[in-house]
Amino acid sequence: MKEKINIGYKIPNIEKLVDKISKVIGLIVPVYVMPLKLKRLDENGYAVFSAGIGTVFINTDILVKDKITPFVIKLFIHELWHVKQMSEGRLVFNENHTIATWEGVKYTNKDTFRPWEIEARKMESKYYKQVKI
């Protein structure tokens, strides 16, 4: 998290976590953390990448608590890994986020097999011990 955006409350623990994960996974683009306003089902976060900047939208309850738990660590590893995938051009979404292109192969929202999600889940376990605060 290179720059600060005022979201109405302080998240110093999460800021430290994002910085640490970014270093551990080799993520070099700026990342903003923003409240997730439109939550669907059990969605706790999602990532976007545009104009060389990653934005991770996180469930507001998690941000307000600013508490680092194993779940929160894995959530941020997962979402920051998606930022890395997008910054490297391996994962690209169309403007409406209805079609994803993963390493040259197109997938729609109807596809249940999403290799970028499988990879991000693996990274949660791979990097958890290195990131644990």
Give, region by region, the residue ranges found by the protein language model:
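Short active-site segment of divalent metal-dependent hydrolases/proteases
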Residues: I77-Q85
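Short helix/loop segments within enzyme catalytic domains
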Residues: E124-I133
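A generic secondary-structure boundary signal that marks alpha-helix termini
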Residues: Q85-M86, K129
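Active-site scaffold of zinc-dependent metalloenzymes
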Residues: L36-P70, M86-S87
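Generic recognition of long tandem-repeat/solenoid scaffolds
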Residues: E3-K4, V56-I58, K65, A100-W102
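Short, conserved alpha-helix that lines the donor NDP-sugar binding/gating region
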Residues: R121
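Post-HEXXH active-site segment of zinc metalloproteases
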Residues: P70, K74, M86-I118
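Auxiliary, metal-adjacent structural segments of Zn-dependent hydrolase domains
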Residues: M1-G52
